């Protein structure tokens, strides 16, 4: 958690840390590094809250090789410390302005101090990939003699390659008398590969973050490492893999860092198919164009429509909507979808449903209907929305506040439909101007999810708030109807 929070722009409150820690614990993560106790009094309160939350995981604090850091960690009731000692000459001489012998001595002394105070100690070599191998072994050996429970090799600026990682970890795991961890950064995009290589070569633990968050290019991704071990190496990690996607979305929402659409496993496109030939293959055998079942990590595959869509895509999408079309009707729906795709239009699930219901001459009464809404906003007013909806023939009035008028009205809608659409999450929100000028027609596209199912919907108006309401309502109706 600490490394993930070092992502630029991320600052987690105590409440957010608790939510993430509980989610990680439910996934059966062994060790949670909740933060750095030296940072501030507020950070110590957050770490202590996590440590006292009754979790099964070992709760850890980051510490420098400074006794004061250990004292602050002890204030937080943590089980262990991640004790980090600089081991490359670059870090020793320029960062802390000491020599090798002094660093060895201090690292051993602080390790012994922490052990004397009842802490589990993981002694970490910072910038180990640029360290003298013999000095690295010496500082690790001193740490073991001082009582260190675990060791860690930090590839601090992502300089390792898998072949070198294998060589290093075969040597360290055979020559040292304590389990060793791997901590990789993703500066060259090799963090996951290096982490898996280290584990295959004898490492007993890996430092990872949800969604690969972290400073600069991030850290090794938990979901990628876990699924590589489970699926490619057939190794049972003990992680509850079906909770991976849900936890990924939680972390993205709480940190405000969106997941790249093409991110492995948890990105929006990871199990999304458009091309007709691919969907045709999926209908015959899911493994044709998928390396694993999306349900394994708690999500569902998605078929999207566009200029590359084929008849198989249309057929499958209609089936998921509970609609049946004969050959002629399918052909007409297919032609209309193709025409929209050729015009460069993003075709949402709601668009397809509208096209299909028009061709099939079906009218479905919306389950959730908008009666009216009011927005109050200004530079000295907290944006507030009140909304009246008809939900399953029952009038519901609710209010919501937000960071702006759009956020406020969406929050009001969520509260109003909570009885029949609990756990619906707004995953993405996009606004495009269709025409120019101050009276421009805007299109709002949203992506909503519920229990792993993801749908898209849109609304187009000259009023951005009304377009947003229309898009969310269209999506809500689709999710509720298909439950």
Swiss-Prot record:
<feature type="domain" description="Pyruvate carboxyltransferase">
    <location>
        <begin position="1"/>
        <end position="245"/>
    </location>
</feature>
<comment type="subunit">
    <text>Homodimer.</text>
</comment>
<dbReference type="GO" id="GO:0009097">
    <property type="term" value="P:isoleucine biosynthetic process"/>
</dbReference>
<dbReference type="InterPro" id="IPR024890">
    <property type="entry name" value="Citramalate_synthase_CimA"/>
</dbReference>
<dbReference type="InterPro" id="IPR013785">
    <property type="entry name" value="Aldolase_TIM"/>
</dbReference>
<dbReference type="InterPro" id="IPR000891">
    <property type="entry name" value="PYR_CT"/>
</dbReference>
<dbReference type="InterPro" id="IPR002034">
    <property type="entry name" value="AIPM/Hcit_synth_CS"/>
</dbReference>
<comment type="pathway">
    <text>Amino-acid biosynthesis; L-isoleucine biosynthesis; 2-oxobutanoate from pyruvate: step 1/3.</text>
</comment>
<dbReference type="Pfam" id="PF08502">
    <property type="entry name" value="LeuA_dimer"/>
</dbReference>
<keyword id="KW-0412">Isoleucine biosynthesis</keyword>
<keyword id="KW-0028">Amino-acid biosynthesis</keyword>
<dbReference type="InterPro" id="IPR036230">
    <property type="entry name" value="LeuA_allosteric_dom_sf"/>
</dbReference>
<dbReference type="Pfam" id="PF22617">
    <property type="entry name" value="HCS_D2"/>
</dbReference>
<dbReference type="InterPro" id="IPR011830">
    <property type="entry name" value="LEU1_arch"/>
</dbReference>
<comment type="similarity">
    <text>Belongs to the alpha-IPM synthase/homocitrate synthase family.</text>
</comment>
<dbReference type="GO" id="GO:0009098">
    <property type="term" value="P:L-leucine biosynthetic process"/>
</dbReference>
<dbReference type="GO" id="GO:0003852">
    <property type="term" value="F:2-isopropylmalate synthase activity"/>
</dbReference>
<dbReference type="InterPro" id="IPR054691">
    <property type="entry name" value="LeuA/HCS_post-cat"/>
</dbReference>
<dbReference type="InterPro" id="IPR013709">
    <property type="entry name" value="2-isopropylmalate_synth_dimer"/>
</dbReference>
<keyword id="KW-0100">Branched-chain amino acid biosynthesis</keyword>
<keyword id="KW-0808">Transferase</keyword>
<dbReference type="GO" id="GO:0043714">
    <property type="term" value="F:(R)-citramalate synthase activity"/>
</dbReference>
<comment type="function">
    <text>Catalyzes the condensation of pyruvate and acetyl-coenzyme A to form (R)-citramalate.</text>
</comment>
<protein>
    <recommendedName>
        <fullName>Putative (R)-citramalate synthase CimA</fullName>
        <ecNumber>2.3.3.21</ecNumber>
    </recommendedName>
</protein>
<dbReference type="Pfam" id="PF00682">
    <property type="entry name" value="HMGL-like"/>
</dbReference>
